[in-house]
Amino acid sequence: MSDASPNSGGGIERVANRLVRAGGLERVAIGVASGMTALLIGLVIVAATGHSPVLFLREMFSGIFGSERGIALSLRESTVFILCGVAVAVAFRAGIFNIGVHGQFVFGGLATVMTILALAPSLPENTIGGWTLIVLGTVVGVVVGGLYAALPGALKAYADANEIITTIMLNFIALGIGLYLLSGPFQGEGIQEPRTESLPDYAAFPDLLFSIGSFSLVGFAIALAVVLLTYVLLTRTRIGYDMVTSGKQESAARYSGVPADRTIVGTMTLSGMIAGLAGAVFAIMVLGGFVDPRGINTYGFDAIAVSLLAANNPLGVVPAGMLFGGLERGGSFIGITTDIPSQLVDGVVGLVVLFVAVPELFRVGAARWYDHGDEK
């Protein structure tokens, strides 16, 4: 191991020190500059493959801002990215790597749909009945997501199991169980592919401002409310203090009497509850039921980059999630309206994501290195 200290004068150390000390505006500027650089490189690649970079750029922005539908679909994607990003950020702030958000998302959405379909026959087919179904289904989805995340949390706290390994394994288990349920016990009647029946029309979020059936401002408002509540929890409560202290300086948390085991399980449970809520909103607002989980976008994995870009700050997750939502929508639109290969579009979008996320990832790693250096 190198004897270099955090205060050594090497080039890498100077860059790390600059990133760690960067203020909020500087970090935003770094992110914007990185994104613009990546986009420029991507456009050069597009031109080198014989396609028009001007067309690429025009269709990208047209897909995001060019119509009411484009804006609505961008906000729809952003809603899910924000919720999943907050779920990841909660765990990461506590120094816990919850890589299982996608599995918790799937189980939360599936549990929500199963609950609504099971209770629908016993409730009136009106607005009151619809909102009752939405609330009850969402509560069940949140609880299921939380319990599914509590399992690897308990394994880490009481059996010293690596949460990265256990959460990744639980992702595959969630996909497998979900596919089994949708191919058998809960497959919709008369439906060939693995999916549930559609939710009742009255058990849906109302259209507000936008007339796009798969998006409602109610879902976006839920995401913003979760962001604010999570921020207050982490910065203004004893529970949040215990979580953040455990993540930043484990030894300091231990000396101050923070119950490490309970904090780990509680943090994972909260993270999973938010992931379950994301799945519930996605199932109600976007799918109107539930489909083969293998075909669902990997929001839980992409949310890791969203959280890193936001420096694991719930407030920062909002612009980061909206960036990812816009890129997702713009990339899809380009694939539909041009002959540019989808692989090339995905590559350029991935390049932007990589360039934007890496500086923040490096900053977080450098900050931890400095903290460990101070402890020594």
Predicted regions and their residues:
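Transmembrane helix-bundle core of multi-pass membrane transporters
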Residues: 163, 167-232
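Transmembrane alpha-helical segments in multi-pass inner-membrane proteins
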Residues: 275, 279, 286-350
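Helix-loop-helix "hairpin" substructures at the membrane interface of multi-pass membrane proteins
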Residues: 215-288
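Cytosolic-side transmembrane-helix boundaries in multi-pass membrane proteins
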Residues: 1-35, 248, 255-262, 331-376
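Single transmembrane alpha-helix segments in multi-pass membrane proteins
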Residues: 44-49, 62-119, 138, 154-160, ...
